Design a protein with these regions (language model features):
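Domain-terminus/edge residues, biased toward the C-terminal soluble/receptor-binding domains
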Residues: 153-154, 167-170, 174-360
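Hydrophobic alpha-helical membrane context
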Residues: 14-15, 73, 277, 285
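A general lysine-centric signal
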Residues: 2-3, 61
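Active-site-adjacent loops and short helices of periplasmic peptidoglycan-processing enzymes
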Residues: 21-174, 178-187
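Short secondary-structure junctions and interdomain/linker hinges
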Residues: 15, 120-123, 284-288
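Active-site-proximal flexible loops/turns
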Residues: 9, 45, 65-68, 244, ...
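Sec-dependent N-terminal signal peptides of Gram-positive bacterial secreted proteins and lipoproteins
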Residues: 4-22
Length: 360
C-alpha cells in the first residue's frame, strides 16, 4: 500500500504543475479575461484576469461531460438513460439550447454525450448530471462541485450542469483551463471533444425522428474565414449575461495548449482574440524540455480509519516542461510542496498543488 501511495503522489508531481506567477500575454480590450496553459503540465503561459469570477455559460458542460465520461469509463455500448420530468421541464421558459428530449425517452449514453457536446443541449446536460449524480440533477451538481474541490480550484461554483447564468454559478479562465485539462484524462472525453463530423442520433422509443448534430464553432470549420487549423476541439458558450465564452484544445508541432476566453462582447471579438492568443503562444513556446530529477524528497503522513497508517517518501521524478524560446532548464527551479497528510480515497481527491515551478 505504501509503495502504491508513493507512486500515486509521484505521478501527481508530473501532472499537477502550478502556474508561473509572471506569465503575461497580449493585452486584450475586447475580451475581459483569458488564460493559456500547457495541456500536459498545466503551466500558465499567458493570462489576463485569469482568476476573475465570471459567468461561464455552456463551457460549464466541459465538467458535466468529464464526469459522465469518468463514470462510464469508456463503456458506452448498451447503456441507456431515461429522461426524467425535471430534465425537460426545469428548462421551461429559459429559451435553452436542446435536442428535444421527451420525458420517458430512453436515450443511449453516447447520444446524450454527443448531443450535449455538439448541440450544447441543456436537456442532455441534465440527463448526464442525473447519470453521474445518483439519479438527480442536484446530485450531479454536487458531484461537479466536489470535483472542483478535488482539483484544488478556488474560483468556481456550479449551480447547474448546463451553464444558464445565475449569481451562484461562476468560474474563472484559470479554473476552466484546469477543468478541461482534467477532463481530457477521462476515457472517451477527447474523442467527444474533438469530433468534427456531423453526429446522427437514431429515433428512440418516443421520438420518431432522426436528429442531427453539427459543429457550430466557426474556428473549426475549414470553409470559414475564422478557421484556425491548430484547434482540435472546443466548447462555445453564450448567454446575455455571460456574453461569449470559449475553451479549446489546440495543437501545433507537438505542442498542446488549452486556451480559455471569457466575456467577449461580440462573437467576432472572440474569434479575433483566440487567433491572437494562439498565434502568440505557438510562436513563443515551440518545444518541450526535459528537466531531470533534482533529487528532492519529502514525507507524507498517510491517515485513515481514525488513525495514522504510516508515512511514505516521495521523490522528485523530473518533469517535462514547455519553456518559452530563450529559456533553458537552467533558468527553472523546482520545489516540492507536499500536503502534510494524505487520505487514500481516490486519485482525483488530491489537491493539485504538489509541484511549484518558479522561473528565475
Amino acid at each position: 500500500m505504501k509503495k502504491y501511495i508513493a507512486a500515486l503522489l509521484t505521478a501527481l508531481l508530473l501532472l499537477c504543475t502550478a502556474l508561473s506567477a509572471g506569465a503575461v500575454g497580449p493585452a486584450l480590450t475586447t475580451t475581459e479575461a483569458y488564460c493559456i496553459i500547457d495541456a500536459d503540465t498545466g503551466l500558465v503561459l499567458a493570462q489576463q484576469n485569469m482568476n476573475e469570477e465570471l459567468h461561464p455559460a455552456s463551457i460549464t458542460k466541459v465538467m458535466t461531460l468529464g464526469l459522465a465520461c469518468q463514470k462510464a469509463q469508456g463503456n458506452w455500448d448498451g447503456v441507456k438513460l431515461t429522461v426524467s420530468h425535471e430534465d425537460v421541464y426545469s428548462l421551461a421558459g429559459t429559451d435553452s439550447s436542446h435536442i428535444a428530449l421527451r420525458e420517458g425517452e430512453e436515450v443511449p449514453l453516447q447520444d446524450a454525450l454527443y448531443g450535449t457536446m455538439i448541440a450544447s443541449a441543456n436537456d442532455g446536460a441534465n440527463l448526464l448530471a442525473e447519470y453521474f449524480g445518483g439519479g438527480t440533477i442536484e446530485g450531479g451538481v454536487a458531484a461537479m462541485n466536489a470535483q472542483v474541490q478535488a482539483l484544488g480550484l478556488e474560483h468556481t461554483h456550479f449551480a447547474n450542469p448546463h451553464g444558464i447564468s445565475g449569481n451562484d454559478h461562476y468560474t474563472s479562465c484559470y479554473d476552466m483551463a484546469q477543468i478541461l485539462r482534467w477532463a481530457l484524462t477521462q476515457p472517451g472525453f477527447e474523442t467527444i471533444f474533438t469530433r468534427l463530423e456531423m453526429y446522427t442520433m437514431a429515433p428512440t422509443n418516443v421520438q420518431p425522428v432522426t436528429r442531427y448534430f453539427s459543429q457550430q464553432d466557426k474556428m473549426r470549420l475549414s470553409y470559414s474565414r475564422y478557421y484556425i487549423p491548430a484547434i482540435r476541439g472546443s466548447k462555445i458558450g453564450y448567454t446575455n449575461i455571460a456574453r461569449y465564452s470559449y475553451v479549446c484544445l489546440a495543437e501545433q508541432n507537438g505542442v498542446r495548449l488549452i486556451c480559455v476566453t471569457m466575456q467577449s462582447e461580440m462573437k467576432t471579438d472572440k474569434y479575433n482574440d483566440v487567433r491572437t492568443l494562439l498565434d502568440y503562444a505557438f510562436a513563443r513556446y515551440t518545444g518541450y524540455t526535459d528537466l531531470p530529477s533534482q533529487g528532492l524528497t519529502g514525507e507524507v503522513e498517510v491517515v485513515g480509519g481514525g488513525g495514522t497508517l504510516g508515512k511514505v517518501t516521495v521523490t522528485d521524478p523530473g518533469v517535462r516542461l514547455l519553456l518559452a524560446d530563450g529559456v533553458t532548464a537552467g533558468d527553472v527551479s523546482v520545489s516540492l510542496e507536499l500536503p502534510e497528510r494524505y487520505v487514500p480515497v481516490s486519485y482525483t481527491h488530491l489537491r493539485a498543488h504538489e509541484t511549484t515551478l518558479h522561473l528565475v
